[in-house]
A protein has these predicted regions:
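Internal insertion modules embedded within essential enzymes
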Residues: 1-31, 35-328, 332-359
């Protein structure tokens, strides 16, 4: 045994360490690797459930760097799971990626459960169970530009879509399935049809030219709603405030317009020339990330590569928990927002991203 160990040590490369499993099998790792790197090298489930280590038959911390010739025995438990702190000391890309994957999956499971809880409170247990397997739920996910019911629940749990939006779209889908033709149009349907009729009138564009971003509020003071920050490409509605406060432009599914009576709603639409002129509008994003040095810089670089201007950036951190990044970016369309969010969401350390209001 000693001769075998000595022969291996003679052939070691400076950048590697060679250690042994309890059965005497040799495992090569990058220099500086720890018990966590070793555990993930054995199997992802060993890494995901390790809670301690014996090195040369002595209890050691998981962050202890392994030395050539060490015998490593990983202690596991079904209730153990990775810690974000491990990312501060692991040395191998395999371990780092597996920890990220576990945390993303765990975070997704939690947000899906939160989404389920929100819907179940509104619909009751039996109604919620029926909803999960319904075509209506699938179509609502599609309308929210999401791939599946699970994606919709996760987006609801994180706040990327609101309960109000989901319930409103569910009502529409259920009405369609139960012959909505026999029922009166909702206020939202009426407003949408008015907007469509207005959009069909060519003289409107000639009368207002290309400089007016919102058509339907000519001669009136208006502002974009801080609560939803509408973008060109999104269906919008104007609301008239009590008193002399002008018109506020909201996304059509903004929760804040639910309590506003129909007589104070104004059909409006985006001028198609807005996107051609390259006008930009503020959008607020909330991003949850695995906390590490340089994560904000990496996100800002990704946005810069896409020629996206960032006008404000703030980070909130708490030890052992995901960091939260609040960004204000300037975008010209709903489609650009969708692409931008997908690009950020695809980054390794990003757990989730949602569009938010300004306050």
């Amino acid at each position: 045994h000693n001769d075998y160990l000595a022969s291996i040590k003679e052939d070691l490369f400076d950048e590697e360490v060679f250690v042994f499993t309890p059965k005497g099998e040799v495992v090569g790792l990058r220099k500086g690797s720890t018990a966590v790197d070793f555990a993930y090298r054995i199997h992802s489930e060993v890494g995901n459930h390790c809670h301690g280590v014996r090195i040369n038959d002595r209890l050691s911390t998981l962050s202890t760097p392994l030395q050539n010739g060490d015998f490593v025995n990983i202690l596991t438990s079904k209730t153990a799971h990775p810690s974000l702190d491990w990312l501060n000391f692991v040395a191998t890309p395999t371990a780092r990626n597996r920890i990220r994957q576990w945390y993303k999956r765990s975070h997704r499971d939690e947000t899906i459960q939160r989404g389920k809880d929100l819907l179940e409170r509104e619909l009751g247990r039996s109604g919620f169970d029926a909803l999960l397997s319904s075509e209506a739920m699938t179509r609502v996910a599609e309308r929210c530009n999401l791939q599946s019911t699970e994606d919709l629940l996760a987006a609801l749990g994180f706040g990327a879509v609101t309960l109000h939006q989901v319930l409103n779209r569910l009502r529409e889908e259920v009405r369609l399935q139960t012959e909505a033709q026999a029922q009166p149009l909702s206020n939202e349907d009426v407003a949408r049809k008015l907007v469509e009729q207005q959009a069909d009138g060519a003289p409107t564009r000639e009368r207002h030219g290309d400089s007016q971003p919102i058509l339907g509020v000519e001669g009136l003071d208006y502002r974009l709603g801080r609560c939803c920050g509408p973008l060109p490409g999104e269906a919008i509605v104007g609301t008239v405030a009590l008193g002399n406060h002008g018109i506020t432009i909201h996304c059509q599914d903004c929760p804040n317009i639910e309590a506003i009576p129909s007589e104070r709603r104004l059909p409006v639409r985006w001028n198609p020339a807005v996107s051609r002129e390259g006008q930009r509008f503020p959008v607020h994003l909330r991003i949850e990330v695995i906390d590490r040095v340089g994560i904000l810089k990496d996100i800002l670089m990704r946005l810069s590569d896409g020629s996206i201007n960032v006008s404000d950036a703030r980070v909130k951190t708490a030890y052992g928990k995901p960091a939260r990044i609040e960004l204000q970016v300037e975008l010209g369309s709903a489609e650009l927002l969708r692409r931008t969010m997908n690009q950020i969401r695809s980054m390794a350390d990003v757990l989730d991203i949602a569009r938010t209001g300004q306050g």
